[in-house]
Amino acid sequence: MKVLVINCGSSSLKYQLIDSVTEQALAVGLCERIGIDGRLTHKSADGEKVVLEDALPNHEVAIKNVIAALMNENYGVIKSLDEINAVGHRVVHGGEKFAHSVVINDEVLNAIEECNDLAPLHNPANLIGINACKSIMPNVPMVAVFDTAFHQTMPKEAYLYGIPFEYYDKYKVRRYGFHGTSHSYVSKRATTLAGLDVNNSKVIVCHLGNGASISAVKNGESVDTSMGLTPLEGLIMGTRSGDLDPAIIDFVAKKENLSLDEVMNILNKKSGVLGMSGVSSDFRDIEAAANEGNEHAKEALAVFAYRVAKYVGSYIVAMNGVDAVVFTAGLGENDKNIRAAVSSHLEFLGVSLDAEKNSQRGKELIISNPDSKVKIMVIPTNEELAICREVVELV
């Protein structure tokens, strides 16, 4: 079976065509600047990268161009649209309606739309991508895979906020969590790599990228996670503040004469390590600045690592123990300094890091010493493959 995996943003569209038998990506690509001038970058598994500058006025045109690239006689990987057996769509927010992936029908589309208030930047774009694919491939089964679904196993004590219960009743204000597809894939892979029984395991997954979140996965189920109603809660991130005193919003708004929307924009797009360091949202730039003596850059890195470690500690309490701590996503997979800084806070647990193994980038391996009481691991995430597997199970 060939599965087309679509991740649709407001002005971009990532895709992979995956052979579900070999679990290999036959082609990967990205449509950028949709609605502006348009650019499609396409690469087949054994071919050169192709960059096509072409107008992409909307997502339907972008999907048509993706199909054309996949079928191109020079760099394509299929000869007919009929070779695409199913399409898997990443959907950011499923609210409480979706605890699992589902085959898309009109009822599902309506339910996704009802969650738009919870993810106004993402869900509408996800729906546009789904509808564009449906118009081009009306007879191909489509599956929605939700970022929030994996975390629907959290108990109430983990997802309820200390606010009037009526807001949960009326508006479903609660912790939802995100990056669920990644947390699910990585936690399962971790139990295999560590030789653990998934039904008797306690794994903490640190998904550290420009967006970052941590989850506590007990016996294969998410029991807590750092992101909340929105992806703004939790860890300090590239541009997001993460946890803070809510009164700061009112305080800054009054001091700076800003509207609520302006303050929220600052917390989402101008805070995190970017705001703290004054350098960049890219940890490579911040580390370079820190090495040159920039104190704000040093502080941003130290606070980031401390916050990660503090969450790890709290999730050990949530699960009454831990077997493995796993680093994944761009930063977690590639930044040895961040992994070492976080792990240094965990030495009281008997954590012992192998410096040579930790120096490797982007490889799946155990980076703790054999005598470490908790396994520390690096597992590259593969959300597209995880979505493909969900699709195969349902169709």
Curated annotation (Swiss-Prot):
Its cofactor is Mg(2+); Mn(2+). InterPro entries: Ac/propionate_kinase, Aliphatic_acid_kin_short-chain, Aliphatic_acid_kinase_CS, ATPase_NBD. Substrate binds at R90. The record marks H179, R240 as: Transition state stabilizer. The active site is at D147 (proton donor/acceptor). Pfam families: Acetate_kinase. Keywords: ATP-binding, Cytoplasm, Kinase, Magnesium, Metal-binding, Nucleotide-binding, Transferase. Catalyzes the formation of acetyl phosphate from acetate and ATP. Can also catalyze the reverse reaction. HAMAP family: Acetate_kinase. This is Acetate kinase. It comes from Lachnoclostridium phytofermentans (strain ATCC 700394 / DSM 18823 / ISDg) (Clostridium phytofermentans).
